[in-house]
Each structure stands twice: as structure tokens, then as C-alpha cells.
């Protein structure tokens, strides 16, 4: 009885000891993996972290590797997809990681039982995807193989064993999403290659590239050339693989079917919902560094955060910094590289290689290098300082010469002479520096352009004292045009009238002369009357009439009240500016002329704008004060009709001057037909008729029949108060019209020549002295000088 109990006790003890040994072996193997968590191996295949064998050795369930004993051999399996693992590679800086697995082969007509295999790879809800490094390979005859369940495109190739012509067999048809085929021809990139070393060309073997987009669900379909699925006939196989198949490696489909598997490369990303894991690695986020790698050698690894290409989950892509190697996903996985041991030739033979964390340095005799560096640095410093001082001196000297040259070329000496002759009459204007105006206009930016005039471009500027100004930068002019520029400065210096744009100063030290005017905020009259997009209903009749009075007052002052009568010579709606209260100001005196009291006309080259030029001035070559009156009459016609100075008659499609069209309509008593519709309802008919009659007098073909600007101004003021008392009668001098028919036809003809002219004919002007109304004129005190 005791002997039997003793035997039983020994048996139980032996079993317990055996179980303890087996458990210890398993625990040792498991703890060995867990101690490194990423340094495990299974069947000779390295399993780097975040993959791992056993609980605690992998990051998440998706990265779990099962090490199974298959036919007496340890084989790693990726448990989330139940696929045998061939190798695992960590992602680099510009690529994803890869896991090579054994994937089942799709077959048709190969099984003795008549059953075909068509497995579908489903990687949904995992960090894995089929990468474009793989190819679709088909082996067999008279079939088409294609991919199923993929996004965007349909990919496939055709098998044909009956083709004997080599030129026909080099083309592999691919299929797009519409079912149409296009050919892709393999090029022999290596000279001397044997034909059997080239890729599958469709004769018993074909292959096609996968789309670049990652795929998580993918299948393979085999069908006959007529497009029907088949389960009979010769054996045909198709599979995805990252291996290169050539004619020399071609295997019969039956042998491939017997293998059952092909090697497939799966891409993977470091997908984790727990960002604290990446934080625990103490890696630097790449966006915080200026370069691909960090210059801080104490940083062992660098990570990128981005959105997953296969899901809406953020993933991390990490790598060891320069000077380190290892697994960045393992805690303290990046270890220093000892460059001095790996390659002692990093340093010269005379130097000593010293390794440190993240790098190395070469230590040698520094005395000679320091002396050479100090001497070179001092010499370079002296040389650079000398060159800088010399350059500064030369630039300053050259700028002084340029300013002096520009001042002389831009008429500075001539302007000084003109202003000196008017000493005591003209107050000095401010002389602006080029730097001031460049700062005010942001270096004459295109965004500051207000408009382009006949003599230059106008910019909006802001002075340092906060004043907004208009800066007129003249065009490049020759010496013959300098008189016009100087003329404008001298004339505007004499003018002190609230309806004339005020000149604030000028700059002559630039390549082209620059004038600075007061800024008029609401642009020109032409824009408000004629531009279609303006749709400006502020231009009611009362405002138009007031603008006409303002212009007439300014011209009356220029003709009568200035120290010397001034003829503008370019009166037009684009030269009439409107301030914030829509009060008119006359601008652009580039072609103006000042005449002495005893002169009756001014002889000059004809200039002006088509539609505004006095026909008598054109015929007689004499510019008088009545020529400005004629141009003002055209503006009155614009205010009444809303038409441009040159119009196209709708009935005849004939291009004529507005002045002629207006006179004909008035003669035929059709004022209501040509009146601007925007003022028809709010205007007083008797006022419009009175202004129209006045415009007719101003547009008379003979200058002697026109009123002077003093009379025009007085009449317009009377019309504003009591239009029924207007002294201008609605009558047309028939004799005058008959005498001027030929002349007016000539005027109409020249309209077709363009918007402006300069014709080589001499012409003069007359001068009338009269007292301007006190309401519009400030004392004529000297304003500007040089």
C-alpha cells in the first residue's frame, strides 16, 4: 500500500517537473522577446517593434505576430490577416514600411475537382495596404486577368500563346475604367539583355502595374478572351507579387498552382490612436526643425505626424537622426553610430577622430590654422571696409552728379530764371526729394496709379504729415518739351482759385520731372458722366449745372483776373476733377499759355483732344480765348446729353463730333431727343433750354459770335437763379451757318483720325481783361517759386 503510494507520488512529481521545465522554456523565450520588444526573431526572421511576439511586445493588436510551429519549423504569421510573414521592414523618411507575406494564388481550370480559387485580400480596418510595388502577373493561354474591388481604375493584361510574330507580342493591353484598352510597350533599358531576361510579354505570361493609390480590398479575376468567366480548359493562374517574372523564370501554370502562394508586399503605417506612445519616444517633431534632419545632435529621432492615406486616423512616421541608427519606434532604439570605428578614414592621418553622441570630430594641431584664419580674417575685414567706404563715396558722388544733371535737364535753371523774373509775385513752392515721393507712392506702385494724362502718369500718395496728394510723374521728354513742363509750374504758381487744382511743389532731381498737387478725391467729370459701370445717379441736373458754373468761374478767372491772361488750351471733361462735395476743379495745365495784355493771339503748334478743338483754331492757326469757350461749350453739351465728345449716330452709323450733333439737334428743335435720360425727370425745362442756348452760342463756328468766359459765367449764374430772364435767345444765325458749312465738314472729317493730335501749324490767342466775381476768386497772391 505504501509502495503504491510512493510510485504515485513519484509520477506526480515527475509530471510537475516536466510541466515546470516546459513553462520555464516558454517563459524564457517570451521574456526574451519582451525584454527587447522588437528585437525578437521567429524562424530566423527579425520582428522589429511595433511588431512583436507575445503580449506586451507589440504596440497594438494589428501588429501582433504569432510564431507557429509548421511542419517542424517556426513560421511567423501576421495574426490580423492570418498571412505568413517573409520579412518586415521599417519605414524610411520618404516611404512606408513594408511587410512581405505569402498570398494565395488565383487559379482557373487547374484543380482536378473543377473548382477554381479566387481569394480576395481584405485589409480593411488595419494599417496595411497593397502597395504599387507589386505587379499583377498572369500565366496561361487565351485569357484575360484583371483586378477586382480596386478604386478608380481597372487594371489587367491579356494572355495569348498563338502569336508568333515578335513585333505583335511586345504589346501588353491594359484596361482603363471604361473598358477601353491601350498598349504599353516594354523598352529594353539594358543593352545586351537576352530576350528571355525581359519581362512577361503576353506569350504565356503577362503582367500589369498596380495603380499608385493604396488598396485595402483587392481580388483577381480570370476570364476567357471573349470576356466570359471560365472554369474549363487549360490551367491558368494569376497572382500579385513584388518579384520580377521574366521569360527565363517562366513556370508552367500547373507548377505555380501547386505552390499555392506568391510573395506579396504590403505597405504599413505607424497607426495609433494613442499619441502618448510617440511622445514617450522623446522624438522631435519634424515641423519644428528647419531641415529634414535636426542639427541638434542630442536629438536621437525625428517624427512626422500626418493623416493616414487609408483612413482618417493620424499616423506617425519616425526615423533616427543623423549620427544614429536603429529602430526609432523602440524605446531608446536609436543608438549612436561610432563613426571612428566604422570608418577611421573620416579624418586625416595627422588628426585624431573623436566620437560623441550623434557625430564625430577630427582633432589636430590648431595653432597654424588659427594664425592663418586670424590673418585672413583681418585682411578680408580691411579689404571689405575699404571697398565699402570707396563704394559709398562713389555712389554719393555719382548721385550728386545725377541730381545736378537731372535738375539741369529737367529745366531747373530755366525754371529758376522764370521764377526770378516774377520775384515778389510768386511764392516759393516746396521742393520734394525723390525719397519723399518714393515713400509716399510706395516706389510709384501700379496700385497707386490714378490715371494717365497727356504729359505723364498720376499717382496717389501719402506724405509724412498725413496729407493725401496727387503725384504727376512726367513722361520721358526731350528738351523741346521742357518748356511745357516749366510753363505748367509757372502758370499754376500764379493761380489761387478754389476751382483750380493747387500745385503744392515739385521734384527735379529725378530722371523725369515730378509735380505734386492737392488730391481731388472723386476723380474726373468724364468718369461720372460717361462710364457705363459707374451708373452714377448723383449727377442730377442741379449738380451738373453747379459744375458748369464752377468751370466757367475758373476759366473766367484765368482769362480775365490773373496777372497775365491764361489760356488753358485743353479744356475737356477728363481735366475737370470733382472734390468730396462734387465741386469742380480745373486741372492739367501742361499745354496752357500765358499771354501779355497787348497780345491778341498766341502762335503755337496745334494741340488738343478730338471733339474739343475749336474749328476756327484749326482753320486759322490762331488760338484765342474763344477757343477755350468752344471747348467749354462741348462740356455743356456733354452735361446736357450725357454723350461723349465723339459719338456714332445710330441711324447712319456715322462718327461725328458731339458739337456738330448737338447743333443740328438744336437747329431742328430736338433737344428733348438728345437730353440725358438721367436728368429728364428732375430738371427744369427752362433751365436746360437756357443752358442749351448758351452752349449753342459757345459752339458757334465763328469765334466773334461766341461770348467770352466772363459773359458765360455771368449767364450761368443768372440761369441758376432765374432761367426765364436769360439773355441768350434760342436762335441760329443762318448766314453764319452757311458760311461755316465747308469749315464744319472739315472738322467732322478729322474726327476719324484718333483721340488726339499734334499738327504742325501755327496758331495764336487773344486776351481780355475783366474783373472776376468775388465769390469765386481768392486774392491773387504769389504761391509758388523755386
Curated annotation (Swiss-Prot):
> Which residues carry the post-translational modification Phosphothreonine, per the record?
433, 604, 609
| Phosphotyrosine modification, residue list | 517, 617
Give EC number(s), comma-separated: 2.7.11.-
Extracellular-facing ranges: 31-369
Mode of membrane association? Single-pass type I membrane protein
Q: Which residues form a coiled coil?
A: none
Name of protein: Wall-associated receptor kinase-like 17
Binding-site list for ATP: 450-458, 472
Q: Which gene encodes it?
A: WAKL17
Q: Which organism is it from?
A: Arabidopsis thaliana
Q: Where is this region: Atypical EGF-like?
A: 301-362
Which segments sit on the Cytoplasmic face?
391-786
Gene Ontology cellular component terms for the protein in this record: membrane
